[in-house]
């Protein structure tokens, strides 16, 4: 019991036994170094500019004229499936795969009369890359620095 009291008075840590003042001065090294190449940095910059353009285009759309129409008027076009069965089967012409492939922005550009005012779709992370999504960061071991050798 006296040993614990002495450790607390001296400021020693339990795991290493080093004085706390030494641990506070020591700046720990990172476990690994993340290197982001120039190509990846350019890709990140391009995705940020594309996101800004997408947001501007969504804000500039004239949605005010369409807000007065009832929501039942604005519906996606449907067509009958090619399968001939007793039940009528319908498919959306704008399927989920189209949304995931092109994003909401190009769907708006293709058929602006079909979609009502902007709503938060499940594909939000796919239509415009954000800070948290669609980043590619490669970790690479830093180059070893060689000391100059002297040849005689």
From Swiss-Prot:
Pfam families: CDRT4 (PF15213)
Compositional bias (Polar residues): 65-74
Region of interest (Disordered), ranges: 1-23, 60-89
Expression (tissue specificity): Expressed in fetal skeletal muscle and kidney.
Extent of Basic and acidic residues compositional bias: 1-11
Name assigned to this protein: CMT1A duplicated region transcript 4 protein
Organism, scientific name: Homo sapiens (Human)
